[in-house]
């Protein structure tokens, strides 16, 4: 029997986070109440502000508290002419950490999934098509996940790009650095062989 309804409510709320079960939620709640109440207050304030103030960029659909995010409003990024299509805002963070891309993004917030009733307009492809028609885009880099749905989504967007004479490319999928071939699955190995490149001296 719980001694505090508020404690129960806190633990239930924490369980909305991915990977957090009853035990983890209980541990988090007790830690905040026993050892870090000031941290808990900062978390509550940050969460409240984020939930009320963060929306979507009008151009790329990533998370931002501005109408247009810092990446899309950057003149150098605009001049680049490249758009990288990703499935989620988290993918932008991953790509930005590499320091290898200097263009802009478009976030689908998912992928095509006819069985789940998710069509082109549900993932913003009408907005992407509008950008292809109106902006000077030289290349669309398709960085959707290497899943069946991700590949289908990439192929659909590639066909869309062809209608506007915009080059479409797919990010390479292959053997991870430090990996051993015998441990790599067949699909990944097939992509690696198909995407091989010449060694020049």
Swiss-Prot record:
Gene3D superfamilies assigned to the protein according to its UniProt record, in alphabetical order: 3.40.1360.10, 6.10.250.240, RecR Domain 1
CDD domains membership: TOPRIM_recR
UniProt KW keywords: DNA damage, DNA recombination, DNA repair, Metal-binding, Zinc, Zinc-finger
GO biological process: DNA recombination; DNA synthesis involved in DNA repair; double-strand break repair; recombinational repair; response to UV
ZnF start-end (C4-type): 57-72
Pfam families for the chain: RecR_C (PF21175), RecR_HhH (PF21176), RecR_ZnF (PF02132), Toprim_4 (PF13662)
Stated family: Belongs to the RecR family.
The protein's name in its UniProt record: Recombination protein RecR
Species this chain originates from: Escherichia coli (strain K12)
Taxonomic lineage: Bacteria, Pseudomonadati, Pseudomonadota, Gammaproteobacteria, Enterobacterales
Gene: recR
């Amino acid at each position: 029997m719980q001694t505090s309804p508020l404690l129960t409510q806190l633990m239930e709320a924490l369980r909305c986070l991915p990977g957090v079960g009853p035990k983890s939620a209980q541990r988090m709640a007790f830690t905040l109440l026993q050892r870090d109440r000031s941290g808990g207050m900062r978390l509550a304030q940050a969460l409240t502000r984020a939930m009320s103030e963060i929306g979507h960029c009008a151009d790329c659909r990533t998370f931002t508290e501005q109408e247009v995010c810092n990446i899309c409003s950057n003149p150098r990024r605009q001049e680049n002419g490249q758009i990288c299509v990703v499935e989620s805002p988290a993918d932008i963070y991953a790509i930005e950490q590499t320091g290898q891309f200097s263009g802009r993004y478009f976030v689908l917030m998912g992928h095509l999934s006819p069985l789940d009733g998710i069509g082109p307009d549900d993932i913003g492809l009408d907005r992407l098509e509008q950008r292809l028609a109106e902006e000077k885009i030289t290349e669309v880099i398709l960085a959707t996940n290497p899943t069946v749905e991700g590949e289908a989504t990439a192929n659909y967007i590639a066909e869309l790009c062809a209608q506007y004479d915009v080059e479409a490319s797919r990010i390479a999928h292959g053997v991870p650095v430090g990996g051993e071939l015998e441990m790599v699955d067949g699909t990944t190995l097939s992509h690696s062989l198909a995407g091989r490149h010449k060694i020049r001296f």
